[in-house]
């Protein structure tokens, strides 16, 4: 997730000049998980989040169609830049969490994204929200989530979850997912990738 200060830094990074390097942004970290593992872990966490409306009150897309269409427009623009490594590998779905007091967004492995209403209402421009969304998309695409969770919870624990076990730990991880602390390197890579996604789009 993003702290208030990080949100401002990400928004500011939108105005950095676009790089001429057309290569897809990549992570320099070591990740022992497969792409399928990322997707399975993300799916289990998403199911846990959806089953916990007290902590994560998800807006119903059928009742808040305009809000979801707004996110769809931004997300599709970023996903279709040709600069993601796992554009066709991951799920890339998004849910809106009703909490006007929280200025945050976060992303689970495999492209499961969550945005708080507080953040959407706080940001004045669509380009600002696009910058934050790009940052979270980058965390998933560069596979920072499983890299960081491996550091925090251990490889064996995450593999048990992928294989369908350790339900108690799934609950714990899901409850703390919005507070996941990425390394400084991960945050820098996500910032740079977000800027790369935004270049040559309507948000440039």
Where are the regions a protein language model picked out?
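N-terminal leader-region detector that preferentially activates on the first domain or presequence
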Residues: 8-9
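C-terminal motif of bacterial Sec signal peptides marking the signal peptidase cleavage site
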Residues: 13-17
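Bacterial N-terminal signal peptides that target proteins for export
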Residues: 1-5
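Metalloprotease/metallohydrolase-associated module, dominated by Zn2+-dependent proteases
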Residues: 36-39, 166-204
